[in-house]
Amino acid sequence: MEGYEGINHGSVLVRVAGNEFLVDSWVASEVALPLTRAVTSAGVGAYRVRAEPFCAYWRVWWLHPAREEEHYFEVKERDVGIARVLARYESTRTDSPFNARLFARKNVTGGVVCLARGARHFRNVDGITRRELAPSDIGQVLIEDFGYPEKVVVRLPPDEP
């Protein structure tokens, strides 16, 4: 991901009938993104995503649910074996931008709701609305907007500074 050094994001590339697609739960466009040597796009509104050729692979642009500007990540490898996937997964346990604070995202009708950095964000085709939350309100948002069980929410540690 942009702004974070090293390899820090994993995506799934699939081949169907000789065509390659990106299927990425983090970007969450809800549709597969065709990957070709031309610029491609998929999704609409808050779910839109696009890819452009970059070096031997692609740069994928997406809408972050809590930030105004588009963000990107670069596809740097393909046909990665399971041993490499598991090793990268294990490395994120100690080195990830998501280890120090809570982040939740959910696609909803008309947009994306997100809880990040002590605020509730909602992105739709018109932009982003943001509501700062008191620490005591975060649990209620997780329960009401995201469907987290209360018994899980009460066990979450506070965000690190």
Descriptions of predicted regions:
Residues 21-22:
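A glycine-rich helix N-cap at a beta->alpha junction
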